[in-house]
Swiss-Prot record:
It is a peripheral membrane protein. It holds the Pfam family GLTP. This is Ceramide-1-phosphate transfer protein. Mediates the intracellular transfer of ceramide-1-phosphate (C1P) between organelle membranes and the cell membrane. Required for normal structure of the Golgi stacks. Can bind phosphoceramides with a variety of aliphatic chains, but has a preference for lipids with saturated C16:0 or monounsaturated C18:1 aliphatic chains, and is inefficient with phosphoceramides containing lignoceryl (C24:0). Plays a role in the regulation of the cellular levels of ceramide-1-phosphate, and thereby contributes to the regulation of phospholipase PLA2G4A activity and the release of arachidonic acid. It comes from Bos taurus. GO terms for biological process: ceramide 1-phosphate transport; ceramide transport; intermembrane lipid transfer; negative regulation of autophagy; negative regulation of interleukin-1 beta production; negative regulation of NLRP3 inflammasome complex assembly. One of its GO terms (cellular component) is plasma membrane. It catalyses: N-(hexadecanoyl)-sphing-4-enine-1-phosphate(in) = N-(hexadecanoyl)-sphing-4-enine-1-phosphate(out); N-(9Z-octadecenoyl)-sphing-4-enine-1-phosphate(in) = N-(9Z-octadecenoyl)-sphing-4-enine-1-phosphate(out). Belongs to the GLTP family. Its main location: cytoplasm. The gene is CPTP. It is found in: Cytoplasm, Cytosol; Golgi apparatus, trans-Golgi network membrane; Cell membrane; Endosome membrane. An N-acylsphingoid base 1-phosphate binds at D56, K60, R106, R110, H150.
Amino acid sequence: MDDLESEFNLKVVLVSFKQCLNEKEEVLLEYYLAGWRGLVRFLNSLGTIFSFISKDVVTKLQIMDQLRSGPQQEHYSSLQAMVAYEVGNQLVDLERRSRHPDSGCRTVLRLHRALRWLQLFLEGVRTSPEDARTSVLCTDSYNASLATYHPWIIRRAVTVAFCALPTRKVFLESMNVGSSEQAVEMLNEALPFIERVYNISQKLYAEHALLDLP
């Protein structure tokens, strides 16, 4: 996990999510998790604003690394294989978190929800005018996604923290792919891949009634 401290570059995230789907449209966990490592570097580059999310994501990545290197690692090559294995062997807590608190299905679900927030936020930044306030874009995206799963006190603290976000221009330049215009071009290329991965994951979880795991 040492690479989480290295400098963020949007292109690394793009490459990972491009490689995330195979010809069967299975979500390959190696590249999914690599994409998330890139996104963690992005969150960290913005300072402490997103630390509440990035710290949780790092914990989830560590859990998945353990599963993918453990005795049942052959079942954790893709999201589809993982779901089939864990659901088929009753390794998922469907009603309350008890026997299997750190199942792969629950762990990836948390990453999946956070990915939706980032996808919406970056899409908002991509399509917004130059004078748009990133704090408003981020808050709107959060309210449409992650806020549903957080208690009021966290929602309040988070929306206050978002007010410290930089201007749209500075935010785009922090992606380290050149000018703000070049960053928008890179988002144009990257976001469809992230959205496709999200949609396939969402459908898979819905088919197995896993979207509301405790």
